[in-house]
Curated annotation (Swiss-Prot):
Main EC class the enzyme belongs to: hydrolase
One GO BP: base-excision repair, AP site formation via deaminated base removal
UniProt gene name: ung
Protein name: Uracil-DNA glycosylase
SMART domains: UDG, UreE_C
Length: 230
């Protein structure tokens, strides 16, 4: 059953760009699966934050894409932005390692908060491949159809924008590289920042590389320092 576009609550530029996706059979299936999961138990992030990454970073503002897998599945963690948690919530291990790399790369002191909203507002699309999860069950919504939707997001950015930096960390993210036109965008690949990768993420210097690339192409670099206000 086709979705009514008026029912999709997402930033207008994304609604236009992704119109065909929202009207597809795949998205109808996502909605059906999501509603079933929601009726069966707690789902993260809260419904109003599912499209938070898109609402904070309009389509034509996208400069950097940081691809995650699925939302955090613990209480009060997921906020619709890959790797991000609300202020006051303990910073997860992968994000701790991201902060360590930013310090090593740019000398920026590690912040106390795990809230990455400031990055999103500057054009960093913090995109998970799967946009929902059941409480306590990692990857539980991996078969819902979200991957087809977020693959389309990556393709739309690649096709319609210029000089975007894609940060692909870990094998699932690296598998998305064929969706991106490397002749007009920068693809940066590294191990996942998770402690399970045994430190292989460190030394990638993706944050300085992104800013050098953006500046070279006439774009304002990202202020990665979360200790200062925008």
């Amino acid at each position: 059953m086709q979705i009514n576009l008026n029912d999709v609550k997402i930033e207008p530029s994304w609604k236009e760009v992704l119109k065909d996706e929202f009207l597809s059979e795949n998205f109808a299936r996502i909605k059906e699966n999501f509603l079933k999961a929601k009726s069966a138990g707690v789902v993260y992030p809260p419904s109003g934050l599912i499209f938070n990454a898109f609402n904070l970073t309009p389509f034509h503002d996208v400069k950097v894409v940081i691809l995650g897998q699925d939302p955090y599945h613990g209480a009060n963690q997921a906020m619709g932005l890959s790797f991000s948690v609300p202020s006051g919530v303990r910073v997860p291990p992968s994000l701790v390692n991201i902060y360590k790399e930013i310090y090593a790369d740019l000398g920026i002191k590690e912040p106390n908060s795990g809230d990455l909203t400031k990055w999103a507002k500057q054009g960093v699309l913090l995109l998970n491949s799967t946009l929902s999860v059941s409480a306590g069950a990692a990857n539980s919504h991996a078969s819902f159809g979200w991957q087809g939707f977020t693959d389309a997001v990556i393709r739309k950015i690649s096709e319609n924008l210029q000089n975007v930096v894609f940060m692909l960390w870990g094998n699932p993210a690296k598998a998305k590289a064929p969706l991106i036109d490397a002749s007009k965008h920068l693809i940066l690949e590294a191990a996942h920042p998770s402690p399970l990768a045994r430190g292989a993420f460190f030394g990638c210097r993706h944050f300085s590389k992104a800013n050098i690339y953006l500046a070279k192409h006439g774009k304002t670099p990202i202020e990665w320092d979360l200790n200062t206000k925008i």
